[in-house]
């Protein structure tokens, strides 16, 4: 008779029960656990406020009008260990963490707002201190217009920028502006926080390099500030800066224009498919005369967001017919006027940096399209222009569009300089370089138009 089974026996219970030892599934067949969703929505998480955790929309997002989205948590937890002692099918834990994808932008349906040809935005966040300027810069009117890109150099005498890559249209900053360059570090949160007086590094989501995520966070913080401080009052933006004159002494682009509801031209043409319906409060803020010019309602950052959507589409477009190019130039100026007229979108340093990026990138578009257009108006060996009808008139219209953007940019720099009292030299250097470059570009256009008129 066998002795009874002792509780201190070394025999496993499953073996004692007669079932035999349990076999683990072979390595590589174990299923990974589904990612755990974050308890708070993206907007509340980035703003560091308590979320009501409502589905499909929390109370705060419902009140502010922001998109409510729940993303996977960045804390993956401890994975289940396999039989061989390694985790996650034998791969080191740090190797798996490197492949994790973090939360997507709050604003759905928009790509990285500054994405473009050669993915220059991704290339610009590195330590090479590259920015997004790509401007027509020949200083000598006698330079051969068709011998290369329009932007060989920009204001080298003032040391603002040192060079440009001809394929991607990316221009690096010079070393003397390295300490004040807002695009100088790998992490955009540190560079933006260093440039803004009184701001903290927690303002920008440190793990995300998405401009869309940064805009979402700035908008969320702005909503919280408005809720605590109440409606703000102040003079309209059109009275903040005086009249602006371009390098050729022409009349400035007026700040005052039709309200947003009447700007139907922005929803047509090559950029129409990128528009989104405006927020009702945003449209009322721009169009209701009963509110008054000094009373500011929250526009939920729609002015800058929608304008940057159009800009993103323009950067992603490889080529346009010349007539569509003219329409795009007009839409650029119209979209910029919307941002400039909105005190909410231009009411803080972070928004002014976004507006500065908008204008710089629009100038990049202008320069690249202009160079491509000039390549099409070169005469063949018989002196005939086979691809473009009436090239002198189209060159004239291009010159007008460049001057308009230059004037709007000068207006931005005036207000930008008022904001950045600690670094006034940066805005002044930008103004000098941009004015000098665009002045030379328009002069070359006029000379080219004269040459075309003489050959026809």
UniProtKB/Swiss-Prot annotation:
Keywords: DNA-binding, Melanin biosynthesis, Metal-binding, Nucleus, Transcription, Transcription regulation, Zinc. It is found in: Nucleus. Gene3D superfamilies: Zn(2)-C6 fungal-type DNA-binding domain. GO terms for biological process: melanin biosynthetic process. Residues 41-68 bind DNA. GO terms for cellular component: nucleus. GO terms for molecular function: DNA binding; DNA-binding transcription factor activity, RNA polymerase II-specific; zinc ion binding. Residues 1-34, 181-206 are annotated as: Disordered. Disruption phenotype: Does not affect the production of scytalone. It comes from the Eukaryota. InterPro entries: OAF3, Zn2-C6_fun-type_DNA-bd_sf, Zn2Cys6_DnaBD. CDD domains: GAL4 (cd00067). Pfam families: Zn_clus (PF00172). Its main location: nucleus. Transcription factor that positively regulates the expression of the gene cluster that mediates the biosynthesis of dihydroxynaphthalene (DHN)-melanin, a bluish-green pigment forming a dark layer in the conidial wall that protects the conidia from UV radiations. PfmaF assists PfmaH in promoting melanin synthesis. PfmaF may function as a broad regulator promoting also other secondary metabolism as well as fungal development. This is Transcription factor PfmaF.
């Amino acid at each position: 008779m066998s002795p009874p089974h002792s509780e201190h026996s070394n025999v496993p219970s499953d073996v004692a029960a007669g079932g035999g030892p349990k076999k683990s599934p072979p390595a590589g067949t174990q299923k990974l656990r589904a990612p755990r969703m974050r308890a708070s929505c993206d907007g509340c998480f980035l703003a560091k406020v308590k979320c009501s955790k409502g589905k499909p929309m929390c109370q705060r997002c419902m009140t502010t009008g922001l998109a409510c989205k729940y993303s996977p948590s960045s804390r993956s937890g401890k994975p289940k260990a396999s039989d061989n002692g390694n985790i996650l099918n034998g791969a080191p834990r740090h190797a798996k963490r490197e492949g994790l994808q973090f939360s997507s932008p709050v604003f759905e349906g928009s790509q990285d707002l500054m994405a473009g040809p050669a993915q220059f935005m991704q290339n610009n966040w590195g330590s090479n201190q590259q920015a997004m300027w790509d401007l027509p810069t020949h200083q000598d009117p006698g330079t051969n217009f068709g011998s290369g890109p329009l932007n060989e150099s920009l204001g080298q005498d003032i040391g603002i920028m040192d060079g440009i890559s001809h394929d991607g249209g990316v221009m690096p900053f010079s070393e003397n502006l390295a300490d004040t360059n807002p695009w100088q570090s790998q992490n955009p949160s540190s560079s933006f926080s260093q440039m803004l007086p009184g701001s903290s590094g927690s303002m920008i989501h440190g793990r995300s390099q998405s401009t869309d995520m940064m805009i979402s966070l700035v908008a969320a913080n702005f909503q919280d500030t408005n809720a605590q401080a109440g409606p703000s009052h102040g003079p309209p933006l059109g009275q903040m800066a005086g009249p602006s004159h371009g390098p050729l002494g022409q009349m400035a682009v007026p700040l005052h224009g039709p309200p947003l509801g009447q700007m139907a031209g922005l929803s047509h043409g090559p950029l129409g498919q990128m528009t989104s319906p405006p927020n009702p409060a945003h449209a009322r803020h721009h169009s209701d005369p009963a509110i008054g010019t000094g009373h500011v309602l929250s526009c939920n950052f729609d002015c800058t967001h929608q304008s940057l959507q159009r800009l993103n589409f323009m950067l992603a477009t490889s080529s346009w017919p010349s007539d569509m190019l003219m329409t795009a130039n007009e839409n650029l100026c119209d979209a910029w006027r919307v941002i400039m007229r909105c005190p909410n979108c231009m009411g803080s340093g972070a928004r002014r940096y976004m507006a500065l990026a908008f204008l710089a990138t629009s100038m990049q578009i202008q320069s690249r399209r202009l160079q491509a257009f000039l390549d099409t108006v070169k005469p063949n060996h018989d002196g005939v222009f086979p691809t473009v009808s009436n090239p002198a008139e189209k060159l004239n219209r291009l010159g007008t569009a460049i001057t308009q953007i230059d004037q709007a940019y000068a207006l931005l720099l005036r207000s930008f300089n008022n904001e950045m009292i600690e670094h006034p030299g940066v805005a002044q250097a930008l103004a000098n370089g941009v004015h000098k470059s665009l002045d030379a570009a328009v002069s070359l256009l006029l000379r080219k138009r004269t040459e075309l008129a003489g050959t026809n």
